[in-house]
């Protein structure tokens, strides 16, 4: 059994750095920037910049802008069944900062943090930064296998993406959620719930947040505006159980003081005026159409190479390669052609990795997706070496 943690972190981090300024096809986590309501957003930002009062030009508090915290709490109660008050909401610089705060508050050196396997390497990096030991827990069709988690008796916390698992895309079953909550209660452990891509389900109504099922106060809930609106906004949020709140506020204050108040105040009005809810509704249809375009293109051009894992939600889908295809080699050559998938093998920890690709579709039109899949097909043929490259269709 190979230990994948250092290699996977390095490979994933390198890929993210290389793609930092790219808008190329297959970019995971990139929303439909072409559909963002720029006029409404720009109008609000301009108005707040012109009328910015002195108190919003000074240092802000580590909890975040109170009107935004109230708007976030109201949205989460209505849309995600989260049990929270504005006092429990902390505004942070995206989900990665939220994970850093969870590690700083909840983990000590050598504590065990469990993660989904495969899962999100960015979470491993944040949780390992305090000296925590990362251990993978396998998945099945219902999500995290809690029976396997039971064997991690020293686990201090578990990080999960129950609404839309990254990278495989399944939702954690309700019965499995109850098992996980009982495990946390019984072991005095914490659950970090990253509500990744929860806004976009295509085949069914989403389950409410795991946090809303928690009667023991063991769940820390993470969300972000970066993927719903645009990544450069760098605003996200935590919902923290009351007994932990003071420690999280202190950690936030030590890490970065506060997030820009201009954007916080503009976002508050963006939500209050209904732009946010309308944008989410429009994007469900947009992403379903783009998902359909990618699935169709894969079936036409790559059905003999790729098996689609799950395509029921979100802004990406994952695929398994047929045996013998090196996903890292494919990703390197794809980057040279301006395509930016993620090698699925880099998402595995503490086990033999399986080869595949994570393909983002949120930021690309149907025409761009069709061209990108044709180019990817030729790249894979070149890597395999068994067939000549095919001309674009």
Please state what every model-predicted region is.
Residues 115, 136, 193, 267, ...:
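Hydrophobic residues in well-ordered beta-strands that form the structural core
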Residues 45, 50-188, 198-216, 220, ...:
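Conserved core of the PLP fold type I
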Residues 225, 305, 344-349:
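Short, solvent-exposed loop/turn elements at beta->coil junctions and helix N-caps
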Residues 41, 215, 220-285:
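Conserved core segment of the aminotransferase class I/II
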Residues 1-47, 249, 253-260, 268-271, ...:
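N-terminal basic, amphipathic alpha-helical segments
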Residues 27-28, 138, 159-161, 192-195, ...:
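Short beta-strand segments
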Residues 31, 162-166, 227, 364:
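Short glycine-rich anion-binding loops that position phosphate/pyrophosphate groups of nucleotides
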């Amino acid at each position: 059994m190979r230990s994948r943690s250092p290699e996977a972190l390095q490979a994933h981090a390198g890929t993210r750095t290389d793609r930092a300024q790219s808008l190329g096809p297959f970019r995971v986590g990139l929303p439909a920037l072409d559909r963002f309501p720029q006029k409404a957003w720009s109008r609000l930002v301009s108005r707040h910049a012109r009328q910015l009062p002195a108190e919003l030009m000074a240092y802000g508090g580590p909890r975040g802008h109170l009107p935004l915290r109230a708007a976030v709490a109201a949205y989460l109660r209505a849309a995600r069944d989260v049990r929270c008050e504005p006092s429990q909401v902390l505004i942070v610089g995206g989900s990665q900062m939220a994970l850093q705060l969870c590690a700083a508050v909840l983990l000590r050196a050598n504590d065990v943090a469990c993660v989904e396997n495969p899962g999100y390497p960015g979470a491993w990096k944040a949780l390992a930064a305090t000296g925590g030991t990362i251990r993978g827990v396998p998945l099945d069709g219902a999500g995290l296998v809690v029976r396997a988690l039971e064997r991690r008796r020293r686990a201090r916390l578990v990080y999960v993406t129950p609404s839309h698992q990254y990278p495989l895309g399944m939702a954690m079953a309700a019965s499995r959620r109850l098992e996980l909550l009982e495990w946390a209660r019984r072991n005095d452990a914490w659950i970090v719930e990253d509500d990744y891509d929860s806004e976009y389900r295509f085949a069914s109504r989403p389950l409410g947040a795991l946090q809303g099922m928690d009667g023991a106060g063991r769940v820390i809930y993470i969300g972000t505006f970066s993927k719903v609106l645009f990544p450069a906004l760098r605003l996200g949020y935590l919902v923290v159980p009351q007994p932990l709140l003071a420690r999280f506020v202190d950690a936030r204050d030590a890490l970065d003081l506060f997030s820009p108040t201009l954007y916080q105040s503009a976002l508050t009005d963006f939500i209050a005026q209904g732009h946010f809810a309308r944008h989410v509704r429009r994007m469900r249809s947009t992403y379903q159409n783009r998902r359909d375009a990618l699935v169709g293109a894969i079936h036409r051009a790559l059905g003999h190479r790729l098996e689609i894992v799950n395509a029921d939600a979100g802004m990406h889908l994952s695929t398994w390669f047929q045996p013998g295809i090196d996903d890292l080699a494919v990703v390197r050559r794809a980057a040279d052609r301006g395509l930016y998938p993620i090698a699925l093998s880099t998402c595995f920890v503490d086990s033999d990795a399986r080869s595949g690709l994570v393909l983002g579709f949120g930021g690309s039109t149907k025409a761009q997706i069709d061209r990108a899949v044709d180019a990817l097909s030729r790249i894979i043929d070149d890597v395999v070496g068994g067939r000549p490259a095919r001309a674009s269709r």
